[in-house]
Amino acid sequence: MALLEICCYSMECALTAQQNGADRVELCAAPKEGGLTPSLGVLKSVRQRVTIPVHPIIRPRGGDFCYSDGEFAAILEDVRTVRELGFPGLVTGVLDVDGNVDMPRMEKIMAAAGPLAVTFHRAFDMCANPLNTLNNLAELGIARVLTSGQKSDALQGLSKIMELIAHRDAPIIMAGAGVRAENLHHFLDAGVLEVHSSAGAWQASPMRYRNQGLSMSSDAHADEYSRYVVDGAAVAEMKGIIERHQAK
């Protein structure tokens, strides 16, 4: 049966995902940045309260995946922290200036991760040559690759995802970006073994008083009175679709 991973941005969302049938959580911060490393406090609270596998993302900033020496040092330290806290896996990825896997740095990450299952995230979708990259990731011992098939969403990239799945000795290919209940059957019919979804929506802040003349963001148009939350009903619906597909 296909595995359902839910992207969560808080301990509360991780619990919601678990309670509604998620098989695994990718734990992140900063949804508007596409997911950054969670704080130590969030990591500890999730580790204490969530019983399904949780894989934190290790990504020090938004933007591209070519990191400075200081950023890479932080990545290694965060990998060690996640390992010490007892998480079963993590999510990360590093590219070089030419859009290839930065093999020396990824080798250091794999050494720091030790027995943890490492997912190479959507840095894969920014790489120059996906099949060569897949070979490199297999050589590193990467457990799985999260990808949209190098398109803006995974449904558009499904043909590439199927090509990657068919590649000999490839890591597990997990489809993600825009995967929802209404299109999930396309991925299941294509033989995708793992799917990744945020399964959520922006929810209004409970704050009643709002100083509309002041922003804490560098983006003057940002809505600072909303937060992204996992929709438990959406998770349950996706899990039900997977179970019914398996029963066919």
UniProtKB/Swiss-Prot annotation:
Any one of the GO CC terms: cytoplasm
Predominant subcellular localization, coarse grouping: cytoplasm
Cysteine pairings via disulfide bonds: none
Family as reported in the entry's similarity comment: Belongs to the CutC family.
Keywords from the UniProt entry: Cytoplasm
Subcellular location(s) per record: Cytoplasm
Subunit structure: Homodimer.
InterPro entries assigned: CutC-like (IPR005627), CutC-like_dom_sf (IPR036822)
NCBIfam families: PRK11572.1
GO molecular function, one term: copper ion binding
Protein name per UniProt: PF03932 family protein CutC
Organism in which the protein naturally occurs: Escherichia coli O9:H4 (strain HS)
Cross-referenced Pfam families: CutC
